[in-house]
């Protein structure tokens, strides 16, 4: 297309894929991030989001991938990174006259301690976020909704990708493997809860479509592979591909959820507020089904996954085998 783009969080797993995908499709991309050594080759902006607000870097499209993502932490840290940070990105996009801002949010905003199937984009209850990360993403989305009403600013598109996986994943799969190695993965409710995953290549595709499709402006989109599966079957497939034995513990979900609440309370008053071994959000995530309806993305963006869950798990296993000492631990 010949347009320019700036991608925040470009030193991260998703951000790096977005940079490479946009460049492969003709965009002149500036990769923005705090760690120069981790940024993709090509034009870069090294600095935090506060510095970006005043940066002299042209962009027709701004993609905001940067975020502090953790089930535990202080509200002030999440607020600065994810709410104030988003405001700084919006400020930058307005100042350089960007036509569109694509914001990568989180389907964590749908989280609840119960099964939720085929969730639509409007089915959000902002009154009861399960942790500070989710609260911060809700605030960031609210900020952008208000901004999208300003005809002088950039058009805003919000994406909510679920369970991003693929070769080089530094978060989702490595966390599971660490638990598996230490004690075995807990199977709550028998591991029957349905899990939606998304190949990182498919998220990058969705970002590009969100940047280009005229009818996407002012809209939020769920993004997944559209292939939900039971947690235990995904775990078995992953470990088999890695050549590891399936080690798990069958535990009563209600008991583990209660213990997690106690651990959160204790860690919350300890010096330094250390992260508890398990949180209620994590327990809820691996206990309950949460699947997303992606019909809006299909109908409006023309989104269709191009990489399957099986292919993503296989590519992770291949990268794992090629890495000294095991997995790509990020």
Q: Across the structure, where does each feature detected by a protein language model lie?
A:
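Amphipathic terminal alpha-helices
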Residues: 292-300, 304-330
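N-terminal Rossmann NAD(P)H-binding glycine-rich loop of SDR-like oxidoreductase domains
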Residues: 5-25
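Glycine-rich Rossmann NAD(P)(H)-binding loop
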Residues: 166, 188-193, 221-228, 239-242, ...
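NAD(P)H-binding glycine-rich loop region in Rossmannoid oxidoreductase-like domains
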Residues: 46-84, 88, 92, 112
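Catalytic helix-loop patch of NAD(P)-dependent Rossmann-fold dehydrogenases
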Residues: 115-164, 185-187
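Conserved Rossmann-fold NAD(P)-dependent oxidoreductase catalytic core, especially the SDR/UDP-sugar
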Residues: 88-132
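Substrate-positioning beta->alpha
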Residues: 139, 170-175, 189-211, 218-222
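Mid/C-terminal beta-alpha module of Rossmann-like enzyme folds, strongest
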Residues: 209-277, 294, 314-317, 327-329
